[in-house]
């Protein structure tokens, strides 16, 4: 999958832009705060109908404007052209059209235009709470498996309903029994698929970390779930119900799962240096790309947002050699330093385009 053209109106700091991209390498250069990340976020929005930066929709519409528009012209691996048109109005439902036909449900779009982004904000994957790591697993699985996406939506809907009931003065145990049984069914599917995903993902991640770091450091991932002991969630929820009534929320379930990230058998967030954390993160995201490529119908678009800062020259060279090789499709790279991008371009024989970003304006 590649994007050939992107047209932007009133998205964040970008008032208007018309971009035509290389099918291989696209380099964006500009100082911080000029709009490089906003352009990448527009690409992310077209794939996932939300910002990579987890900001609400009303914050992506340019200040003082009523609506933002994003239009992308794509070409899939069979050679077919596809137009996406997304309109965003504060306080309104987003409207997404594919070849002029509106999606009835935005969830039907997820996974059809695969994209992987590596950015400084991804540090929360290592340093943040467990919800960040669950989101990583969910994003990957939702792109590949519509049944997983459906199970996750239903589980979260029932979880919200249970939490509402836990806050009520009147306790309806019969209704709670039914609700927990339904949650147990969805949770079993979610847990099983998360577990299998990590089993498939781990060898790919290990190989990439070794390639980038050039060291024998042992890294690993460990999936932890309340369901790991084989007790159905409905039974766990029934047992925890008295405590949950006191707490006012559901204290167990797959919404509490954890993905432990380990360096030498110890949580990397406790011992990792800045360089080790960044190498771990980039390896995770490139493994996400590889896994999506292996299990999906289309090669994802890869966005690399200011990833070379805090890395030594040897690791930068290894990453460049890795993503510049066969198997990676269309790539977008941002940097504040034109010299860095020139060195990257010089090391590749691929077709490329260079864009300069200044105050929300894009020059080619």
From Swiss-Prot:
Cellular compartments annotated: Cytoplasm
Pfam assignment, any one: SMC_N
Keywords for the protein's UniProt record, in alphabetical order: ATP-binding, Cytoplasm, DNA damage, DNA repair, DNA replication, DNA-binding, Nucleotide-binding, SOS response
Chain sites annotated for binding ATP: 30-37
GO annotation, cellular component aspect: cytoplasm
GO molecular function: ATP binding; single-stranded DNA binding
Gene Ontology biological process terms, A to Z: DNA replication; DNA synthesis involved in DNA repair; double-strand break repair; SOS response
Broad class of the protein's primary localization: cytoplasm
Family to which the UniProt record says this protein belongs: Belongs to the RecF family.
Family annotation (NCBIfam families): recf
PANTHER family: DNA REPLICATION AND REPAIR PROTEIN RECF
General function of this protein: The RecF protein is involved in DNA metabolism; it is required for DNA replication and normal SOS inducibility. RecF binds preferentially to single-stranded, linear DNA. It also seems to bind ATP.
Listed name of the protein: DNA replication and repair protein RecF
